[in-house]
Amino acid sequence: NRLCCSQYGFCGTTSEYCSRANGCQSNCWGR
């Protein structure tokens, strides 16, 4: 499992990081 990273440079595996609606930049959920 790769970490998702937000637009602010924070990474994690929860929706806070993985959801595009929350500003995800990399390894986001969906395609």
Curated annotation (Swiss-Prot):
One GO term (biological process): killing of cells of another organism
Q: What keywords appear on the UniProt entry?
A: Antimicrobial, Chitin-binding, Disulfide bond, Fungicide
Task: Tell me if Nucleotidyltransferase is a UniProt keyword of this record.
Answer: no
Q: In which tissues is it expressed?
A: Seeds (at protein level).
Task: Name the Pfam families for this protein.
Answer: Chitin_bind_1
Q: Where is the Chitin-binding type-1 domain?
A: 1-30
Protein name, UniProt field: Morintide mO3
Origin organism of this chain?
Moringa oleifera
